[in-house]
A protein has these predicted regions:
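The alpha/beta-hydrolase serine catalytic core
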Residues: 48-125, 129-146, 150-156, 161-184
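Primarily recognizes the serine-hydrolase "nucleophile elbow" in alpha/beta-hydrolase
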Residues: 16-74
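Catalytic nucleophile-loop/oxyanion-hole region of alpha/beta-hydrolase
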Residues: 1-21
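A generic local structural motif
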Residues: 14-15, 38-40, 109-115
Length: 184
């Protein structure tokens, strides 16, 4: 807990690709998994392997704004604990979130610059719900505009939330995966 960093999660995913995925691969990533999928798809070493993406409510560059929002809501003792570099556990909608300043600072090096074209050109479907309280769906609009690929589609569902897990959303997810597989 004290030493794990976001880059470790990214490297774990890269290791899975190298060790367990032979041939063309379509990555399906939800929330931070969408961010990780984009980071991997933008790496030169995976250009020949990753052939498609399906991203559900991708939480790009999520940690800093989320951390600062949560830190504002802490009491003074908890804020001082964070400033000393220690971990603070906070109950939230996902269960317990562990806040650590060094984790957030280190994750900044993996943030994607959406003011520049993002060099990912594989078929990509981005799915997002308007009712997503964790990641605004407008972030996915910005991502779609940034990707250099031309086979990119964004599906925004008015009644869907962050998990995109209601029956109709799951049908859209399955169809999107089929579309990407067909297009590669």
């Amino acid at each position: 807990m004290e030493t794990v960093q976001f880059k470790d999660w990214v490297e774990d995913a890269a290791t899975m690709l190298v060790e367990h995925c032979d041939g063309p691969t379509v990555l399906v990533g939800s929330s931070m998994g969408g961010w990780i999928s984009l980071l991997l798809a933008s790496r030169r070493e995976f250009k020949d392997q990753i052939k498609g993406l399906v991203l559900v409510a991708p939480a790009l560059n999520f940690f800093r704004p989320h951390y600062h929002q949560m830190a504002k809501e802490l009491n003074l003792e908890q804020q001082a604990t964070l400033e000393r570099g220690e971990v603070v556990a906070v109950e939230d909608e996902w269960g317990v979130t562990y806040l650590r300043k060094s984790f957030v600072e280190a994750s900044a090096e993996l943030e994607l610059d959406l003011s520049q074209p993002l060099e990912v050109s594989v078929p990509c479907r981005i799915l997002h719900g308007v009712r997503d309280a964790s990641v605004p769906y407008r972030n996915s609009v910005e991502l779609m505009e940034t990707l250099v690929g031309t086979n990119v589609e964004l599906v925004v569902r008015k009644k869907a939330e962050h998990r995109f897990s209601e029956r109709k959303s799951l049908e859209v997810l399955a169809q999107s995966l089929e579309d990407v597989i067909r297009d590669i």
